[in-house]
Amino acid sequence: MALIVQKFGGSSVKDRDRIFNVARIVANTHNAGNDVVVVVSAQGDTTDDLIAKAAEISHDPSAREMDMLLATGEQISISLLSMALNEIGCHAISLTGWQAGFRTDRAYTKARITRLETERISSELERNRVVVVAGFQGLNKLDDITTLGRGGSDTSAVAIAAALHADRCQIFTDVEGVYTADPRKVRNTRKLEEITFDEMLELASLGAQVLNNRSVELAKKYNVELEVLSSLNPVPGTIVKEVVKDMEGMLIKGVAKDTDVAVITILNVPDEPGTSFKIFGLLA
């Protein structure tokens, strides 16, 4: 019997059909004799919709109240997925981030995990239940709800896998793995069978949307091997790990695009002490 952590993004649970598709994936894993912890994001564009609702009320809402609001998105997802699992005969229970034991610092909207108390998750697994956990959220020392920032559900999944010493951590997305470029934008890309943590971090920092860079950093720190898969097409994905055996030693593994980066060229700058400081000090 293996312990498997499975994470599903918002597009994987955006509607009824997708939720039942995820439920079948999870149930098949559990029915094969495995313990399963599932981490789920908010449905579809729920987080963006909640941000828009806040903007209708306040032009400058406090970070604490935003966390109270945004955390509700994942709670909808975990309850619906747990219902779907129970509906198809797979015993499941949903837990919020704080019920699952996530404790964080006080940096609202971009909190860092300080510890994970795994007793509740472990006790539910012992009862042969699938545990469905709300990603992206936790509780700080003031007992306030906090969120981990964009992509926080990936980080939640890796943290659970590390704390429970899981045998596998599977990240399900709407693509079939990590490609040499974004397959939704570039033709004839190639899926990578394996990629190192460092290579994945570089791609993530340059704008690749497959994995959140904080989750990869955490996976590297605790040596949690990741498997990136599609929730829509059951084919082998990409393994992200510390060392990759690559006989030919590819010089370039992938290409990513970041539209938020601009290049400014300044011509005819006088070669005088302090000139660069004056220019770049203003830009900074």
Which residue ranges define each predicted feature?
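Active-site proximal loops enriched in glycine and acidic residues that flank catalytic Cys/His/Asp
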Residues: 173, 228-230, 268
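Terminal amphipathic helices with adjacent charged low-complexity linkers/tails
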Residues: 40-47, 228-247
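Acidic-aromatic/histidine active-site loop/patch
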Residues: 219
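A broad, low-specificity signal marking well-ordered, structured residues that form hydrophobic/aromatic
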Residues: 131, 146, 226, 238, ...
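Flexible, glycine/charged-enriched surface loops at secondary-structure junctions
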Residues: 34-38, 211-214, 225-231, 235, ...
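A conserved regulatory-domain signal marking ACT and ACT-like small-molecule sensing domains
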Residues: 237-284
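Nucleotide/pyrophosphate-binding catalytic subdomain
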Residues: 1-216
